[in-house]
């Protein structure tokens, strides 16, 4: 299933400071080097989806402040 890409200017994206490129978040206090969507527990590789944004896909190299390490 193809999900429409999440627009960083969308309200829910802005609420979590989502960016398409993790480098854009380097100055965010919660950001740590190496964190990006494709190594987050909420990322769904088969659809490039995210459990936090169920109606959209996210960039694998993106980031948001809810990033959580995969177990």
Swiss-Prot record:
<dbReference type="InterPro" id="IPR036369">
    <property type="entry name" value="HIPIP_sf"/>
</dbReference>
<dbReference type="InterPro" id="IPR000170">
    <property type="entry name" value="High_potential_FeS_prot"/>
</dbReference>
<keyword id="KW-0249">Electron transport</keyword>
<feature type="binding site">
    <location>
        <position position="37"/>
    </location>
    <ligand>
        <name>[4Fe-4S] cluster</name>
    </ligand>
</feature>
<keyword id="KW-0004">4Fe-4S</keyword>
<feature type="binding site">
    <location>
        <position position="40"/>
    </location>
    <ligand>
        <name>[4Fe-4S] cluster</name>
    </ligand>
</feature>
<feature type="binding site">
    <location>
        <position position="50"/>
    </location>
    <ligand>
        <name>[4Fe-4S] cluster</name>
    </ligand>
</feature>
<keyword id="KW-0411">Iron-sulfur</keyword>
<feature type="binding site">
    <location>
        <position position="64"/>
    </location>
    <ligand>
        <name>[4Fe-4S] cluster</name>
    </ligand>
</feature>
<comment type="similarity">
    <text>Belongs to the high-potential iron-sulfur protein (HiPIP) family.</text>
</comment>
<feature type="modified residue" description="Pyrrolidone carboxylic acid">
    <location>
        <position position="1"/>
    </location>
</feature>
<dbReference type="GO" id="GO:0046872">
    <property type="term" value="F:metal ion binding"/>
</dbReference>
<comment type="subunit">
    <text>Homodimer.</text>
</comment>
<dbReference type="GO" id="GO:0009055">
    <property type="term" value="F:electron transfer activity"/>
</dbReference>
<dbReference type="GO" id="GO:0051539">
    <property type="term" value="F:4 iron, 4 sulfur cluster binding"/>
</dbReference>
<keyword id="KW-0408">Iron</keyword>
<comment type="function">
    <text>Specific class of high-redox-potential 4Fe-4S ferredoxins. Functions in anaerobic electron transport in most purple and in some other photosynthetic bacteria and in at least one genus (Paracoccus) of halophilic, denitrifying bacteria.</text>
</comment>
<protein>
    <recommendedName>
        <fullName>High-potential iron-sulfur protein</fullName>
    </recommendedName>
</protein>
<dbReference type="GO" id="GO:0019646">
    <property type="term" value="P:aerobic electron transport chain"/>
</dbReference>
<keyword id="KW-0813">Transport</keyword>
<keyword id="KW-0479">Metal-binding</keyword>
<dbReference type="Pfam" id="PF01355">
    <property type="entry name" value="HIPIP"/>
</dbReference>
<keyword id="KW-0873">Pyrrolidone carboxylic acid</keyword>
């Amino acid at each position: 299933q193809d999900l429409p890409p999440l627009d960083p200017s969308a309200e829910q994206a802005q609420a979590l400071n989502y960016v398409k490129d993790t480098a854009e978040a380097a100055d965010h206090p919660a950001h740590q080097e190496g964190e990006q969507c494709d190594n987050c527990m909420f990322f769904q590789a088969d659809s490039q989806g995210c459990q936090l944004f169920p109606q959209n896909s996210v960039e694998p190299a993106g980031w948001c402040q809810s990033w959580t390490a995969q177990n």
